[in-house]
Design a protein with these regions (language model features):
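Bacterial N-terminal signal peptides that target proteins for export
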Residues: 2-12
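N-terminal signal peptide c-region/cleavage motif recognized by signal peptidases
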Residues: 20-21
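Periplasmic c-type cytochrome electron-transfer domains
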Residues: 3, 24-736
């Protein structure tokens, strides 16, 4: 629902919002007009490949390294590549053995596989069918009607068998030495199956625009060289050669690098890719001395890897023509790999000390993958390529698609799926074009704040009370699942600190600056909130949702240039006023709505990236539109009820719903659909369930006799010109 920039009284604004929610039949103003992705700048990473002493000295070599690492099944302990969960338009389109028993926040004791809506086992090794979706079903899918089926099970991504890591082979075997056995949760009878993640795998295409990565934002905007946690990790750093006989561990601080922060996590995760207790240093020891993609065909016309391939027009061959270590040396500054001695790091018993090349492998791996993924920008969809009229309408779309765009703007979709990437999580990129393309963020009478603020404020209902709550920019709760199943950005990092920027910001306002873990929280400007936190108007009374002079105010410490709100709102509560409000039994001014909030995904290529939502609970775009038409599934406290509520123009008009889906399909880039450069790739053999079904599997996996035999989905090597056949949508991959 809308907030109005010219309305300085928060109670009036809230009244307008909640009244208009009730008046469903009323005509709503249109939201922001999306624009082409061609206008969106990639957020810069100072110091990565620029300046007098860059980290990357050969960017094309680094991109080649990143692409090889992303697609190489030797990265995993038992055949999982990064691409194994991101092969279908950057997402995961598998349909067998994709079910996890409960969300990310479910205790192990409560992780129980349910039955499907037809009472058959919805568990390990099931082949999903269209009838299994959605995972929450209503008697009338367009209305807040009786629930006829619900499960907390998640459609995630099948990964590894796990097991206790023991060692690697440096040259030949792609599987690690691990003590493996049947998993206590992921099994069919006595036979172990591959584990499945408790969240759906989002696309990596256009992910370079995200300020943070992962659904919960735990992949920090700052890359520290060795972990996902940015400046939060006190032990992070990289090894730098400072002299012929000296190497020193130094801190690294690369902004706009959440893709690098993300990249270091899956290869060490014992559900996604790894045996337990394996580090990225072990992965480096395994890979650096062998050829990239040594068991996978590489197309001679691959847009990146072609010059390094062993293939020719007559025959495709596996691997590249140089080892990983050589690519690293070509791509990265010598001070990160040229030290000839060992680094002072603890090593497992009986193993040789780590070289500098091995010790810095997490940095090489992460930055190379980030640079590769930064090339995966799909800005040539029909929506992008259309001419525009004076009102910025894409005139080359059909009448149905244009009506779908109107429905997209009218039914609150554009408030979260904002800007050229259709995501408010693209913070820096959206802020960079807010002045040059204001139409992307609303009309003069109603506009969405598109600043560099990582915290924002909107009216919500929390605990039944109307409040103006803080939330993390680019994160929201739409009520897709119960709050207890997965608390999303309301969780904490490995050190016990909140992931949420909003929770840190509350502590900052209350005078506890030591609680701030992420430096961008200190830069949040009060005058750039969607709805104000304070007003400096001389009012003779206090307000329930807004700090006033009576409470105690101080000017915001940052500049007031180009503020979104009037300058009377460029104020903050004093620390004493903020702390007093936090300590109240009923707090309405210092509320953070972050529990069960998740990163707003891009809608680009959305027809190819199902299943949908963080829990993979919907198979088709039609099911997604039904979900939003009825206003979601659950009424969580952090739910954005002023944006997700029943939409009468969709509930009552099947043509509007069909047209909205038609518009969403104009966001598909045919280069993605046909796997053309830069979306071409090597061959990949992807684990896709096991021999048998959800009732019985065939044991005798070569890794361990107690494990089920793998089945595979084989992806052929594709060159720059792409494939002859288009990628199918997720529902087309499902069983009848």
């Amino acid at each position: 629902m809308r907030t109005f920039r010219n309305c300085s009284h928060p109670l009036l604004a809230a009244a307008m919002l909640f009244a208009s929610m009730a008046a469903f039949a009323a005509e709503l103003p249109l939201g922001p007009m999306p624009i082409s992705l061609k206008y969106l700048p990639v957020p810069p990473v100072p110091g990565l490949a620029d300046g007098s002493d860059p980290i990357v000295v050969n960017k094309p070599a680094a991109i080649a390294l990143g692409k090889a690492l992303f697609w190489d099944s030797n990265v995993g302990s038992d055949g999982m590549a990064c691409a194994s969960c991101h092969f279908q338009a950057g997402a995961d389109g598998r349909s067998k053995n994709q079910i996890s028993a409960g969300g990310q926040s479910k205790p192990v004791a409560e992780q129980i596989f349910a039955d499907s809506s037809d009472a058959t086992p919805l568990g390990p090794n099931r082949t999903l069918s269209l009838a299994d979706f959605p995972l929450h079903q209503r008697l009338d899918p367009l209305a807040d009607s009786a629930v006829v089926f619900d499960t907390d099970n998640v459609v995630g991504s099948a990964g590894t068998f796990a097991g206790e890591f023991k060692g690697v082979n440096r040259f030949t075997s792609g599987t690690d030495i691990c003590n493996r056995a049947a998993d206590p949760v992921f099994r069919v009878g006595a036979n172990g199956t591959r584990r499945v993640t408790p969240r759906n795998a989002p696309t990596v295409i256009n992910a370079v625009f995200n300020h943070r990565s992962f659904w919960d934002g735990r992949a920090n905007n700052v890359f520290n060289g060795s972990s996902p946690w940015g400046d939060r990790d006190p032990d992070a750093g990289v090894w730098v050669k400072t002299g012929p006989r000296n190497v020193q561990k130094q801190r690294l601080h690369l902004i706009n690098s959440s893709l690098a922060s993300l990249a270091v996590a899956p290869p060490a995760n014992h559900t996604e890719m790894s045996c337990s207790n394996r580090s990225l240093l072990d992965v480096g020891r395994k890979l650096l001395y062998r050829a990239p993609l040594q068991n996978q065909l590489v197309h001679h016309a691959d847009s990146v890897l072609g010059p390094y391939s062993n293939s020719n027009p007559e025959k495709l061959n596996p691997g590249l023509n140089l080892p990983y270590g050589s690519l690293v040396r070509q791509a990265f500054n010598a001070k990160y790999w040229s030290y000839s001695g060992s680094v002072p790091l603890a090593v497992p018993a009986g193993q040789a000390p780590y070289t500098q090349l091995e010790a810095n492998f997490p940095m090489f791996f992460a930055l190379a993958i980030q640079l590769y993924e930064s090339t995966l920008i799909s800005d040539q969809a029909p929506f992008d390529n259309s001419a525009r009229d004076a009102n910025h309408q894409p005139v080359d779309l059909s009448a149905a698609e244009l009506n779908g765009l109107k429905q997209f703007r009218k039914n609150q979709c554009a408030l979260c799926h904002l800007g050229p990437n259709f995501s408010s999580a693209s913070i820096a990129a959206n802020a960079a074009i807010a002045q040059s393309h204001p139409e992307a963020f609303g009309e003069p009478t109603f506009r969405i704040s598109a600043s560099s603020n990582v915290v924002n404020r909107i009216p919500l209902l929390v605990g039944g009370l109307p409040v103006t709550a803080f939330y993390d920019t680019g994160f929201s709760s739409n009520g897709a699942s119960r709050e207890a199943n997965d608390i999303g950005a309301g969780s904490v990092d490995d050190f016990g600190n909140p992931l949420s920027f909003s929770l840190q910001y509350l502590q900052l306002l209350a005078g506890n600056s030591a609680a701030v873990q992420d430096s961008e929280v200190n830069a949040v400007r009060a005058c750039d909130f969607q709805d104000a936190v304070a007003t400096n108007l001389k009012l003779p009374y206090s307000l329930p949702n807004l700090f006033t002079q009576i409470d105690g105010l101080m000017p915001q410490p940052q500049s007031t240039a180009n503020c979104f709100l009037p300058l009377v709102n460029a104020f903050l509560p004093t620390p004493a006023a903020a702390a007093a409000e936090l300590n109240k039994a009923v707090n309405r001014k210092m509320v953070a709505a972050v529990t069960a909030t998740f990163k707003t995904p891009s809608l680009r290529n959305i027809e190819l990236t199902g299943p949908y939502m963080h829990n993979g609970s919907m198979a088709t775009l039609e099911q997604v539109v039904e979900f939003y038409s009825r206003g979601g599934n659950f009424k969580n406290d952090s739910k954005h009820v002023t944006r997700v509520f029943p939409q009468p123009t969709l509930q009552t008009d099947a043509q509007n719903r069909a047209d909205l889906v038609a518009f969403l399909k104009t966001l598909t880039d045919d280069r993605v659909r046909y796997q053309r450069a830069p979306f071409d790739h090597p061959e990949l053999k992807i684990p896709h369930g096991h021999s048998g079904d959800e009732v019985a599997t065939v044991a005798g996996n070569p890794l361990n006799a107690s494990l089920s035999k793998d089945e595979y989905l084989r992806l052929s090597a594709v060159g720059a010109e792409g494939a002859a056949e288009p990628l199918p949508a997720f529902e087309q991959r499902l069983a009848p």
